[in-house]
Amino acid sequence: MKLTCVIVAVLFLTAWTFVTADDSGNGLENLFSKAHHEMKNPKDSKLNKRCLDGGEICGILFPSCCSGWCIVLVCA
């Protein structure tokens, strides 16, 4: 009986922590809206992107920069 009460109390406090947690950045809301946008516009999805933008780290032997230039391990 005591163990059951402890388990219920722990579950309640855990749920209460998640419910009352302050999400000032609206992280989940932004995540879901972004995912919905990518479903509506598949061209905007990062999974379809095959090259790296300027300023991103690249490899010397196999550069995958959109511009085709990999200078000092950074896409130009």
Curated annotation (Swiss-Prot):
InterPro entries per UniProt: Conotoxin
Q: Where is the signal peptide?
A: 1-21
What's any one GO cellular component for it?
extracellular region
Q: Which residues form the propeptide?
A: 22-48
User: Does the entry annotate any disulfide bonds, and if so which pairs?
Assistant: 51-66, 58-70, 65-75
Q: Where in the body, by tissue, does this protein show up?
A: Expressed by the venom duct.
Q: Does the keyword Methyltransferase apply?
A: no
User: What's a single GO MF annotation on this record?
Assistant: ion channel inhibitor activity
Query: What are the record keywords, sorted?
Result: Cleavage on pair of basic residues, Disulfide bond, Knottin, Neurotoxin, Secreted, Signal, Toxin
Compartments annotated for it: namely: Secreted
Q: What is its main location?
A: secreted
Domain comment text? The presence of a 'disulfide through disulfide knot' structurally defines this protein as a knottin. The cysteine framework is VI/VII (C-C-CC-C-C).
Q: Which family, according to the similarity comment? A: Belongs to the conotoxin O1 superfamily.
Q: Would you tell me the protein name for this molecule?
A: Conotoxin MaIr332
Give the organism, scientific name: Conus marmoreus
